């Protein structure tokens, strides 16, 4: 770095020169100014020299030291300062602090840049608002995005649909009617299949054929027969009578109108029982083809009456026979019918005798084909 030689020396005798004090002050100012221009002096270094200079007396007409210092400060402020601050390392920032003038210049540059940025931001906001207002005033312009509930499915345009295939094939195979001698080409398999399906759907199906399963009578399967209870006690014994009475009481409580009891041994057959209960009055009819079984049933009626009374049912009419009531009615009806036919037969014979028959008809019946000459 270039260093300027100090301008003030202690050996110079300034007393012999005219205006020595003024020249000393001027020389001191020039020395300070040269050091400030070289960038090597600081305010702390220049302050003692200025203080030394102020101790010297001034003559009339000489400039004051304070005026000289103010002129030096103004000259320092007039030094051009670059807008871009120099790059300062950490070591330089700690060793050489900035001067007051440089700090003020840097602050002015920073304020200027901040003002420019704020103006640019305001300008951008104003331009954006103006553009949005202009676009909103344009007809048919809508900034709001349209929200759709379901994503629209776009069919691929590369693959033709079945309808386009059919239409193109029909157009290629179609020919004008005026072309002579060109036989009609058969339809494609896809078109033929589609037409056949359409014909099947359009043709009404007969109602009778569809309704035939409903009209046919439902074949009911026979219900499984419940095995009739068996009276295993000896016929006519007290145990047999008790068992018979208990079964009949159970039938009345269950509301059954007909029941069967098998006897032991099996040769005795079964006892068919018909019940009818009305206002706690029971009517019973028991049928058995064996005479000694019917006698045992008649002997068990008192025990049966007592058993029903314990259940709150009074035995009213009882009937024990060798055939059922329906069989008796059928036999009676057949007997009456035979009697009616017997009564009508003699009447038919009398009618045949009394009917007048012509002689010609009688001759035809007897086979006599002669001619009556006396007629």
Curated annotation (Swiss-Prot):
Extent of Low complexity compositional bias: 328-339
Source organism superkingdom: Bacteria
Region (Disordered): 319-363
Keyword hit for NAD: no
Xref: Pfam families: Flg_hook
GO biological process: one example: bacterial-type flagellum assembly
Disulfide bonding pattern of the chain: none
Keywords from the UniProt entry: Bacterial flagellum biogenesis
Gene Ontology, cellular component aspect: bacterial-type flagellum hook
Domain characteristics, as noted in the entry: Two-domain protein with the central portion of the sequence acting as a hinge or connector between the two.
PANTHER family named in the record: FLAGELLAR HOOK-LENGTH CONTROL PROTEIN
Function: Controls the length of the flagellar hook.
Family statement drawn from the similarity comment of this UniProt entry: Belongs to the FliK family.
Protein name: Flagellar hook-length control protein
Species of origin: Escherichia coli (strain K12)
């Amino acid at each position: 770095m270039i260093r300027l030689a100090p301008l003030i020396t202690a050996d110079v005798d300034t007393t012999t020169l005219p205006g020595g004090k003024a020249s000393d002050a001027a020389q001191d100012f020039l020395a300070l100014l040269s050091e400030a221009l070289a960038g090597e002096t600081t305010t702390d270094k220049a302050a003692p020299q200025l203080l030394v200079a102020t101790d010297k007396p001034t003559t009339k007409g000489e400039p004051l030291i304070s005026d000289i210092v103010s002129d030096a400060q103004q000259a320092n402020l007039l030094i051009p300062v670059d807008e871009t601050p120099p790059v300062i390392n950490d070591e330089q920032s700690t060793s050489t602090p900035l001067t007051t003038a440089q700090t003020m210049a840097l602050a002015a540059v920073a304020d200027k840049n901040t003002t420019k940025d704020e103006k640019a931001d305001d300008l951008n906001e104003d331009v954006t608002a103006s553009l949005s207002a202009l676009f909103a005033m344009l007809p048919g312009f809508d900034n709001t995005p349209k929200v759709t509930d379901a994503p629209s499915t776009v069919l691929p345009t590369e693959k033709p649909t079945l309808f386009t295939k059919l239409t193109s094939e029909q157009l290629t195979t179609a020919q004008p009617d005026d072309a002579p001698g060109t036989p009609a080409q058969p339809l494609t398999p896809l078109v033929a299949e589609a037409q056949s399906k359409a014909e099947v759907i359009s043709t009404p199906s007969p109602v009778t054929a569809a309704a035939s399963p409903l009209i046919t009578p439902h074949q009911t399967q026979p219900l499984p027969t419940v095995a009739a209870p068996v009276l295993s006690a000896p016929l006519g014994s007290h145990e047999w009578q008790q068992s018979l009475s208990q079964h009949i009481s159970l039938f009345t409580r269950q509301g059954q109108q007909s029941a069967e009891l098998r006897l032991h041994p099996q040769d005795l057959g079964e006892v068919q029982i018909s019940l009818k209960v009305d206002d706690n009055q029971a009517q019973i009819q028991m049928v058995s083809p064996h005479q000694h079984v019917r006698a045992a049933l008649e002997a068990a009626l008192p025990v049966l009456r007592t058993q029903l009374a314990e259940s709150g049912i009074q035995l009213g009419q009882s009937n024990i026979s060798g055939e059922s009531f329906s069989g008796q009615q059928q036999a009676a009806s057949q007997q009456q019918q035979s009697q009616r036919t017997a009564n009508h037969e003699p009447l038919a014979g009398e009618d045949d005798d009394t009917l007048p028959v012509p002689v010609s008809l009688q001759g035809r019946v007897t086979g006599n084909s002669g001619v009556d000459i006396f007629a």
